[in-house]
Amino acid sequence: MGIRSYRAYTPGTRNRSVSEFTEINKSRPEKRLTSKVSKHQGRNNRGVITSRHRGGGHKRLYRDIDFRRDKQGVNGTILTIEYDPNRNARICLTSYEDGEKRYILHSRGVMIGNQILSGPDAPIVPGNALPLTNIPLGTSVHNIELQPGKGGQIVRAAGTVAQIIAKAGQLATLRLPSGEIRLVPQACFATVGQVGNIDANNRKLGKAGAKRWLGKRPKVRGVVMNAADQPHGGGEGRAPIGRKRPLTPWGRLTLGKRTRSRQKYSENLILRRRKNA
């Protein structure tokens, strides 16, 4: 799972680097576990842009990932390690003893042919899923549920890992990749180990077209716009923003302004905010 760098054959390859894909052994997904994805270009049901700088991109099929890991007590065998265009982590096609096949996130160190298991009695090895109450302190975990039975919601990106640092009562204390320390019910399931493809953050797109393949459109800086279009715009030549604080195109404070609601139910479960928050 290394990174391949290009020589400067063209301006686009001068600073370009991509994943080697050496761990992938299958190019086409399991057809029964895929579905169509409709593109919305960042627009809502009325056609209004609600998320800017989105559109285009390569056509994708969605892979149905088993984040719940609710097939308990049934051994599974890793058949393939595959590329998933919808995430930067790799996925594994798993065949269970009863004949069912499911996709799961690829855990670092899991190889083709390995056995995995989900349930309270599963051994503590990468790829197995257990309730937090059955996982020892100090263990690295990922794909963590926030509510029992809802499926993993956090720590799912490539190379991410959380650590169990304490348990008290019905809650476990986790240190998340962002530096946040959070309480999670011990009945929640988590997968042992670290998410694979740890070099995902070391890739360099190298050219604008690579960003367009991902469905990301150009971002125009507000300081180069007209004053009618953005609060930072206007002025003669290269002018500063002319405000005490940076503002969004709609005049709201940004770049450091906290946007998280204090009325969220989980506010009391966060013991320490994430870094730079």
Swiss-Prot record:
GO biological process, one term: mitochondrial translation
Claim: Plastid is one of the keywords in the record: yes
Basic and acidic residues bias (residue ranges): 24-33
Compartments (UniProt record): Plastid, Chloroplast
Positions of the UniProt region annotated as Disordered: 24-56, 227-251
Keyword Manganese applies: no
GO cellular component: chloroplast; mitochondrial large ribosomal subunit
A molecular function (GO) term: transferase activity
Keywords: Chloroplast, Plastid, Ribonucleoprotein, Ribosomal protein
Domain of life: Eukaryota
Major site of localization recorded for this protein: plastid
Subunit annotation: Part of the 50S ribosomal subunit.
Family: Belongs to the universal ribosomal protein uL2 family.
Protein name: Large ribosomal subunit protein uL2c
Source organism: Spirogyra maxima
